[in-house]
């Protein structure tokens, strides 16, 4: 079984002999920041405030999904409903970067799985949103095996990973 590419959703939904049912999200797309390379917590916080996750959800996933903070989606019995997602706030991001003395000439290496076009597109949106607040990121698309190797080596600044877990009964 495989996921249906996002670009095919509308045409499949339009088929008369198909009843589309959306289940709870079981895939989490996460961005990891290597703290050794981005040591100031204010910069890491700014990176999160600078991302408009609702825009990504709506533009790339047609609103099918959820914005969460944390590793587990609401489909997990271990999901913590008390955690409120950090809001999109580019002005707060800029303020945190200024407070941290961020060097805007620095370019972060942002590794993404080349095998997932939706995730590559999301990384492009994220990089543009970071650029709007003064954070440069160069996207490096690599195959999944290389991405996992880089993750284990910790030789990255930013890494985007997708996790899917089996739905629970």
Residue ranges and their predicted role:
Residues 5-14, 165-169:
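A ligand-binding cleft/hinge motif common to bilobed small-molecule-binding domains
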Residues 4-5, 98-165:
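Ligand/substrate-recognition segments at binding pockets and active sites
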Residues 10-24, 30-41, 77-92, 102-105, ...:
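Short, solvent-exposed loop/beta-turn-alpha elements that line the ligand-binding surface or hinge
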Residues 6-7, 14, 25-69, 96, ...:
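Alpha-helical secondary-structure segments
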Residues 15, 28, 66-67, 73-74, ...:
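Residue-level signal for pocket-adjacent positions within structured domains
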Residues 66-99, 117-121:
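Structural transition elements
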